[in-house]
Amino acid sequence: MANKRKEFIKLNLNKERKAFIELRGINLELLKEFLSSNVLPLTFIGSLLILILTIVYYFTLSGSVNELKNEISKEKSKKERLLSEIKRLEELKKTLETKKAIYEVVKIYNDMVIKILENPVNLPYGYSLQNFSLCAFRFKNCDIQEKLNKDKSFSLDKPIAQLDLVLFNRKLENYIPPDSIRKFTYVVIDNLPYRRVCIEPDYERLLAEKGHRKEE
């Protein structure tokens, strides 16, 4: 009786195992069929979409990088133009300040001449401006356009003034440093001894003195 029961249990176990194996086989086949018919195509399509999106993103990013490079290049060009313009304006400012200082120097010399003419008795002890070769101003015999046409090397940056000085006063000697004298000769005009000098004024010193006077 006991043996029959064991055989019956064993038979049932074998049936259950066989049924489980059959069930597992059915599930595996269904799973394979499901994967091959649904999941794999979806995976392929998903991968293809990701690839397309990656390519689009790459070209979009490349375009943005190129646009950024172009903007940087434009800003760099603008900066260079601004620096160049600033440099030009600084040079122009310096030139204008120098010319203004020249005008002031000429006014001083002209005032000297007026004083001499007003008081001829003191002529041997004064100053006489016979010629000023700057030609940046329109005197009776000095025209800048004519000077430029005749002398192509003529420049207004640092002009040289030719002065005829009567008995060269010490005050003027102090005003004109020796290193600014370019030429020095003696002449006699109306029986009066003159020292004719060609000088190159120290315009930077004049500008510095002018600024110092303003501060005072």
UniProtKB/Swiss-Prot annotation:
Membrane keyword on record: yes
Localization recorded for this chain is: Membrane
What is the recorded membrane topology of this protein? Single-pass membrane protein
Q: Coiled coil where?
A: 59-108
Cellular component, GO annotation: membrane
What residue intervals traverse the membrane? 39-59
Top-level taxon: Bacteria
Instruction: Supply the alphabetized keyword list.
Output: Coiled coil, Membrane, Transmembrane, Transmembrane helix
Listed name of the protein: Uncharacterized protein aq_2145
Provide the taxonomic classification: Bacteria, Pseudomonadati, Aquificota, Aquificia, Aquificales
